[in-house]
């Protein structure tokens, strides 16, 4: 495959960076060789009510997995995100809110956000919510979502944010599993001009016969449209906060007290309630935010993620606010009502740091220069990518078009379970290789092992594991510690197994190759789907590609590629041959797709991730049970793909 360019550290950035290349090497060595002294110092990024004495008490031994950090210290997350900033920077902007409708935007200062959080914290207390109680949040991307999360943290309640695109069935499952006592929602949400019936979805979820724990629903008025109302259960947000006291002392929380539960998909189809605790999580979210984004006071930072995902928790809310950052919250989507919306928002709010997902980048890339028409984006200094490996072609487009060829890209690898960045460039400390997540963050010890757990030394490829704990690590799966141990620590004894594969090059840089179950075995050759997809989308006419394996009588697996073309391109027999020839040139004959399935839509979750499980089943003809499709943004895509497949000639 053609080698990507290598981009050196820009001199302008090196002059004022928080961490230089030499400092990174020294600090990383200290963080690995003496984690106690390193994290004792760096944990001071937050304020402690009771200072901790013990830094690290962890073991990955399969018999008794135990993860505890700063365990004898106490603190409060909301106080760290708000109260401690008030004296010197209370009138600084905390949140810039940009509505789905570009004419709607507003700002909240740290003082205003603090008052709103205290009021809502008192509302929760008046409803009987206290330390350890679970509150489910099903909210649109409005500042009140952040207020509700911080209010829970202030009084010691555990929030469980449910992404505002999930179905009633998915909501019910999460409420049942967490035994949430109260739900916070809105009448409706807005996204790309469409109304999302949030309150109706909650009503339907609460009608589930096994949902018995919820006795109150607080409803924020977003659109003002008519909704069903149950007077004995439902309360308007504005009525509840009317007259509520705007002072609420923060609860002193143990470092290992739960902060939030966030549900993520499990391989069995049953969602996993990932549990993060207070001290280690906040230390890690704040530290990674500060150094990976090279954040300087006054920078305007925009993470495009929804609060319903871990990226929204760690890098829209908690990490930035703990560092007294200016964080932009966006209700809309990057390419509506025009392809240039994301670039317009950057210019409108003079965004300095932009953090978005490859799926958004590829969608804009397919629009060509329409994505930047009429904008200059000169305020940008650093950009980031999150959610999945970014293919070099999309990286280059993002770098040259959105970033004007001068903004380092931090391609971050991490997971819901890790709490924060694990492998990522530091923009002032590392040269960049498009498509590579670069090197581990402080305290993170990655390794590659083969399928029996034997270490792969030097340059090579294998299963990506982490050999020791880090502060942001999830502590358990809510109510199911056995599943936690089995999922992450039993495959390779004494190591955390990420479920991802990776390649390490001769410089020690890591290249994430995708989920291990996304590795194809074609005639005995192991091929990562990520590598094949990257080569496909490097073709000038291809916007997006998803590659899966399908059974083959001779090869074992054949390569089945779902391909979306750029706007204005149409599939032809000539293009079919052209793409296959391109793949032979880029990777080799072994990586030539056996099937090219042209389609204008792929099955994606509402967070933009491609649901490969469904693509695998369609390719294999195993469509009798596609499993849970409730998280799909457009369930109709599945039927369309099945119809398209009937027109294809398939290999035997």
Curated annotation (Swiss-Prot):
Q: Reply yes or no: does the keyword Acetylation apply.
A: yes
Q: Which CDD domains match?
A: ACS
Binding residues annotated for CoA, in chain numbering: 191-194, 311, 335, 523, 584
For Mg(2+), which residues are the binding ones? Answer: 537, 539, 542
Q: Which reaction does it catalyse?
A: acetate + ATP + CoA = acetyl-CoA + AMP + diphosphate
Tell me where in this chain the PTM N6-acetyllysine is found.
Answer: 609
Q: Name a GO molecular-function annotation.
A: metal ion binding
The organism's place on the tree of life at top rank = Bacteria
Q: Which cofactor does it need?
A: Mg(2+)
Alphabetically list the UniProt keywords.
Answer: Acetylation, ATP-binding, Ligase, Magnesium, Metal-binding, Nucleotide-binding
Record-listed E.C. numbers: 6.2.1.1
Q: Name one GO biological process term.
A: chemotaxis
Q: What does the UniProt record tell us about how this protein is modified after translation?
A: Acetylated. Deacetylation by the SIR2-homolog deacetylase activates the enzyme.
Q: Which Pfam families match?
A: ACAS_N, AMP-binding, AMP-binding_C
Q: Can you tell me which residues bind ATP?
A: 387-389, 411-416, 500, 515, 526
Q: Name one GO cellular component term.
A: cytosol
Enzyme category, top tier: ligase
Q: Entry's InterPro entries? A: Ac_CoA_lig, ACAS_N, AMP-bd_C, AMP-bd_C_sf, AMP-binding_CS, AMP-dep_synth/lig_dom, ANL_N_sf
Described purpose of this protein according to its UniProt entry: Catalyzes the conversion of acetate into acetyl-CoA (AcCoA), an essential intermediate at the junction of anabolic and catabolic pathways. Acs undergoes a two-step reaction. In the first half reaction, Acs combines acetate with ATP to form acetyl-adenylate (AcAMP) intermediate. In the second half reaction, it can then transfer the acetyl group from AcAMP to the sulfhydryl group of CoA, forming the product AcCoA.
As for family, the record states: Belongs to the ATP-dependent AMP-binding enzyme family.
Name of the protein in question: Acetyl-coenzyme A synthetase
Native species of this protein?
Sodalis glossinidius (strain morsitans)
Q: Which gene encodes it?
A: acs
């Amino acid at each position: 495959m053609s080698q990507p360019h290598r981009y050196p550290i820009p001199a302008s950035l090196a002059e004022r960076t928080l961490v230089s290349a030499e400092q990174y090497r020294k600090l990383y060595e200290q963080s690995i060789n003496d984690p106690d002294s390193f994290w004792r110092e760096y944990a001071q990024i937050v304020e402690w009510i009771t200072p901790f004495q013990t830094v690290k008490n962890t073991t990955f031994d399969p018999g008794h997995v135990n993860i505890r950090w700063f365990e004898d210290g106490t603190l409060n997350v909301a106080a760290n995100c708000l109260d401690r900033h008030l004296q010197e920077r209370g009138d600084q902007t905390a949140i810039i809110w940009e509505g789905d409708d570009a004419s709607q935007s507003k700002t909240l200062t740290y003082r205003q956000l603090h008052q709103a959080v205290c009021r809502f914290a008192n509302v929760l207390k008046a409803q009987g919510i206290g330390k350890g109680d679970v509150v489910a949040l099903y909210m649109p991307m409005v500042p009140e979502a952040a207020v509700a999360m911080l209010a829970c943290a202030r009084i010691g309640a555990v929030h469980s944010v449910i992404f505002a695109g999930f179905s009633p069935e998915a909501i019910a499952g999460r409420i049942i599993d967490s035994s949430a006592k109260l739900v916070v929602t809105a009448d409706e949400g807005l996204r790309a001009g469409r109304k999302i019936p949030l309150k109706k979805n909650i009503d339907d979820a609460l009608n589930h016969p096994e949902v018995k724990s919820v006795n109150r629903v607080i409803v924020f008025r977003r659109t003002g449209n008519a909704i069903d109302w149950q007077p004995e259960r439902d309360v308007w947000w504005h009525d509840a906060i009317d007259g509520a006291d705007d002072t609420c002392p923060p609860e002193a929380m143990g470092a290992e007290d739960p902060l939030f539960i966030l549900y993520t998909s499990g391989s069995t189809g049953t969602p996993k309630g990932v549990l993060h605790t207070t001290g280690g999580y906040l230390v890690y979210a704040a530290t990674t935010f500060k150094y990976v984004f090279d954040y300087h006071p006054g920078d305007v930072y925009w993470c495009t993620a929804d609060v319903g995902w871990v990226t929204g928790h760690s890098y829209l809310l908690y990490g930035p606010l703990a560092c007294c950052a200016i964080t932009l919250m966006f209700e809309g989507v990057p390419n509506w009502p025009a392809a240039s919306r994301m670039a317009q928002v950057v210019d409108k709010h003079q965004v300095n740091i932009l953090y978005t997902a490859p799926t958004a980048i590829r969608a804009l890339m397919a629009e060509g220069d329409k994505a930047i028409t009429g904008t200059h984006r000169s305020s940008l200094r650093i950009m980031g990518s999150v959610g999945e490996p970014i293919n070099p072609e999309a990286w280059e487009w993002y770098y040259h078009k959105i970033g004007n060829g001068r903004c380092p890209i931090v391609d971050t690898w991490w997971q819901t379970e890790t709490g924060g960045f694990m492998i990522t460039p530091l923009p002032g400390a590392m040269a960049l290789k498009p498509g590579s997540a670069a090197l581990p963050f402080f305290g993170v010890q990655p390794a590659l092992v083969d399928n029996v757990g034997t270490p792969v030394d030097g340059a090579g490829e294998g299963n990506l594991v982490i050999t020791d704990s880090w502060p942001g690590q999830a502590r358990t799966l809510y109510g199911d510690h056995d599943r936690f141990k089995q999922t992450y620590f039993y495959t390779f004894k004494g190591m955390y197994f990420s479920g991802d594969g990776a390649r390490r090059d001769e410089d020690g840089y890591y290249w994430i190759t995708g989920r291990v179950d996304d590795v194809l075995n074609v005639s005995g050759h192991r091929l990562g789907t990520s590598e094949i997809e990257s080569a496909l989308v490097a073709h000038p006419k291809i916007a997006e590609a998803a590659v899966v394996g399908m059974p083959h009588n001779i090869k074992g697996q054949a390569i089945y590629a779902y391909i979306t073309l750029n706007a204005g391109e149409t599939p032809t027999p000539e293009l079919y041959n052209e793409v296959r020839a391109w793949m032979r040139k880029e990777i080799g004959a072994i990586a030539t797709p056996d099937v090219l399935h042209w389609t204008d839509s792929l099955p994606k979750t509402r967070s933009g991730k491609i649901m490969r499980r469904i693509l695998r089943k369609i390719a294999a003809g195993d469509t009798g049970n596609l499993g849970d499709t409730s998280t799909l943004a457009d369930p109709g895509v599945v039927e369309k793909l099945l119809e398209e497949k009937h027109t294809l000639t398939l290999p035997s």
